[in-house]
Amino acid sequence: MITRLAIAGYRSIRSLVVDLAPLTVVTGANGSGKSSLYRALRLLADCGEGRVISSLAGVGGLDAVRWAGPERGTMRGQRTEGTLRSGPVSLRLGVATDHLGYAIDLGLPVAQRSAFDLDPQIKQEHVFAGADPRPAGVLVERKHGSARAMADGGWAELARSLHPWASVLDEFAGHAEASELAGARRMLRSWRFHDALRTDATAPARQPQVATRSARLDDDGANLAAVLQTAIEMGGERALSAAIDDAFPGSSLLLPMSDGRMQVALEQPGLLRPLTAPELSDGTLQYLLLTAAMLSAEKPELIVLNEPERSLHVELVPALAARIREAAEATQVVVVTHQAALADALGGTRVELEKVSGETTVAGREGLLDQPVWHWPKR
């Protein structure tokens, strides 16, 4: 389980450390930084997939996402003024778990003639044991082009000339001297994100789908029917039936198949025929998609939901909250929401964000000293 998340130098987040629980609910007003926290988690997952550089380049590079305020921030109530930068531009992301942690420090490229000047560079990476990447707990260390791993006899060199766009998670995941890299990579790659699931008229979830066993929901929901059928065959029929009846009393889920394709249909009281996926309301389809994500046969280490209440009528919120709470019994869940009704129904651990002088902070904290401890390695 993820125990601590640290973000520094990202959009409206100058320095933020939060502890995560089995179910964490992130709330806050519009513009408070909820989306920045969500995107930072996605960037960490991109590190596990080897695409963090391309993801940042795709949105305009480090200049487009770095901390947007003064280098040292602004005291509450004071006027924000520009200052001369004394340190390097840095985007730092880190996560600690019960077993392993991972931290990355990204910076601007050294001035050179290149068509890829928007690409940030990896300055440091650390895989560690414990609550943060302090020296005593570091297991693998990468500084610029050099990388080394802690072995029985001390430090073992892994590389001296790593490319600035190459991560140690990709380059040495199978290295005999650094088995922790494979564990950290596997942890990050297991995370699942669900954001703005499509429910429009041409949404993939409304189309007949290839009938093939599917252990998890695709990002676009294209395998909705297959995920639900897989969950049924893996012992989830009772939970799925309860989820449908909870939201739509007296209704039954059908998964008709023809010519190797299947689709979702809903049999409802008072109707003479089932309604197929193209006929379902946006809210009904959204609920089915989220239910599939929560009940899928594959149980990731982390599920992150960004504003799952979209398109849902308020009457469906208690049923959705029940599905999320049930999922959190087997999988860690982070929910980012601005709906008070959903946040209250979920319970869990609340992290309320607010903006103070343009900077995202956790409501109720007095300052940087009033947050969980995290030591960023120096460059």
Label every model-predicted segment:
Residues 1-14:
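N-terminal pre-Walker A segment at the start of P-loop NTPase domains
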Residues 26:
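Hydrophobic anchor at the beta1->P-loop junction of P-loop NTPases
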